[in-house]
Amino acid sequence: MRNFDLSPLYRSAIGFDRLFNLLENNQSQSNGGYPPYNVELVDENHYRIAIAVAGFAESELEITAQDNLLVVKGAHADEQKERTYLYQGIAERNFERKFQLAENIHVRGANLVNGLLYIELERVIPEANKPRRIEIN
């Protein structure tokens, strides 16, 4: 099991501590680490989650976002034929991976490329929370 220290990222993400805490907490869930995934900081307001879903067709994957919860499910079709393996090193099990998202993080899209599912996220700051210039009288 790997331990990831995201604390160096806290310095450049003032006010985003909650996002990193939620991502760290997500690692401790009892899902066995399958499938593996990466969370990438693309720029100040954009993130990308890459999930290794080799062996799954696009039609076997389901992505749902509700409130601040992103759920990715993979379920193989029941019609797969029974195989006799001499050695099976590639997992073919179904999965459900959940990501708790910080406030104002929106899912912008997803695509499947070469066995990796990429989910694009964007931080959208409401107008009320954006900095405003105060005039001095």
Swiss-Prot record:
Pfam families given in the database record: HSP20
UniProt entry keywords in alphabetical sequence: Chaperone, Cytoplasm, Stress response
Q: Where in the cell is it found?
A: Cytoplasm
For this UniProt entry, what's an example GO CC term? Answer: cytoplasm
Q: Where is the sHSP domain?
A: 28-137
Q: Which Gene Ontology terms describe the biological processes this protein takes part in?
A: protein stabilization
Functional note: Associates with aggregated proteins, together with IbpB, to stabilize and protect them from irreversible denaturation and extensive proteolysis during heat shock and oxidative stress. Aggregated proteins bound to the IbpAB complex are more efficiently refolded and reactivated by the ATP-dependent chaperone systems ClpB and DnaK/DnaJ/GrpE. Its activity is ATP-independent.
The family assignment reads:
Belongs to the small heat shock protein (HSP20) family.
Summarize subunit and interaction data from the UniProt record for this chain.
Answer: Monomer. Forms homomultimers of about 100-150 subunits at optimal growth temperatures. Conformation changes to monomers at high temperatures or high ionic concentrations.
Q: What is this protein called?
A: Small heat shock protein IbpA
What gene is behind this protein?
ibpA
